[in-house]
UniProtKB/Swiss-Prot annotation:
PROSITE patterns: HORMA (PS50815). Adapter protein able to interact with different proteins and involved in different biological processes. Mediates the interaction between the error-prone DNA polymerase zeta catalytic subunit rev3l and the inserter polymerase rev1, thereby mediating the second polymerase switching in translesion DNA synthesis. Translesion DNA synthesis releases the replication blockade of replicative polymerases, stalled in presence of DNA lesions. May also play a role in signal transduction in response to DNA damage. GO terms for cellular component: cytoplasm; nucleus; spindle; zeta DNA polymerase complex. It is found in: Nucleus; Cytoplasm, Cytoskeleton, Spindle; Cytoplasm. Residues 13-203 form the HORMA domain. The keyword Cytoplasm applies. Homooligomer. Interacts with rev1. Interacts with rev3l. Interacts with fzr1 (in complex with the anaphase promoting complex APC). May interact with cdc20. This is Mitotic spindle assembly checkpoint protein MAD2B. Keywords: Cell cycle, Cell division, Cytoplasm, Cytoskeleton, DNA damage, Mitosis, Nucleus, Transcription, Transcription regulation.
Length: 211
């Protein structure tokens, strides 16, 4: 078994690649399942050996890709605590927050290629859970939109400023109303633990969604 520290960036990049690829699929699937956009803009694809729905809308896809492209260097440095998909009503108040809590161990234990295969199996379980999450959530009001939030560790601020200059992608401090909901209903969806990554997904759902 090989043990690497967080400073071994080559493997840190592998972890970031795996996670960002997963998050891209997960965001698309959340938008489809929660009917944020018309189903006509989605096409069925196969990811992690299961069917998923991916958007064909260029601007939407670019927003998701650009966000994750800028998040990737922060994940490499273990500076990301949460990635959140916030679904907003017409008044731009959050009705649902899909929260991906991310933790990486300071030492990465790599035993074999089977580890990555195991991680893929764990991520597949997340995708399957997202695909049926509407069974435990109330319907959202019509006309919803969404935004992506990234919760970082305090030390990440300088890195974000550098990335903003390099990538020409503006980071904006989130509005307080996007970050918090009053007394939301908490719905745990899935948790995974592996030698390279720990992650849990839960939904914060507003008690009254009707507008």
């Amino acid at each position: 078994m090989t043990t690497l520290t967080r400073q071994d960036l080559n493997f840190g990049q592998v972890v970031a690649d795996i996670l960002c690829e997963f998050l891209e699929v997960a965001v698309h699937l959340i938008l489809y399942v929660r009917e944020v956009y018309p189903i006509g803009i989605f096409q069925k694809r196969k990811k992690y050996n299961v069917p998923v729905q991916m958007s064909c809308h260029p601007e939407l896809n670019r927003y998701i890709q650009d966000t994750l492209h800028c998040v990737k260097p922060l994940i490499e440095k273990n500076d990301v605590e949460k990635v959140v998909v916030v679904i907003l009503d017409k008044e731009h108040h959050p009705v649902e927050r899909f929260v991906f809590e991310i933790a990486q161990p300071p030492l990465l234990s790599i035993s074999s290629d089977s580890l990555l295969s195991h991680v893929e199996q764990l991520l597949r379980a997340f995708i399957l859970k997202i695909s049926v999450c509407d069974a435990v959530l109330d319907n959202n009001p019509p006309g919803c939109t969404f935004t992506l939030l990234v919760h970082t560790r305090e030390a990440a601020t300088r890195n974000m400023e550098k990335i903003q200059v390099i990538k020409d992608f503006p980071w904006i401090l989130a509005d307080e109303q996007d970050v918090h909901m009053q007394e939301p209903r908490l719905i745990p969806l899935k948790t995974m633990t592996s030698d390279i990554l720990k992650m849990q997904l839960y939904v914060e759902e507003r008690a009254q969604k009707s507008t």
